[in-house]
Amino acid sequence: MKVTVNDEAVEVDEQTTVAALLDRLGFPEKGIAVAVDWSVLPRSEWETTLADGARVEVVTAVQGG
């Protein structure tokens, strides 16, 4: 099935969770925020299974000065 991650199509297996997708794509475990279908997903819900066509946005915290 296909999901969109930060405006790029990604092919994933059925039953793929948010956490598994993030791991597969190499995102760090800390310092990120995730939204699925325009709703921010707390880390406690990252084991949620993605639906076909889901839109995932990942924002990485950047420290600056």
Question: Where are these predicted regions, by residue range?
Answer:
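Ubiquitin-like/PB1-type beta-grasp interaction modules and other compact soluble beta-rich domains
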Residues: 1-64
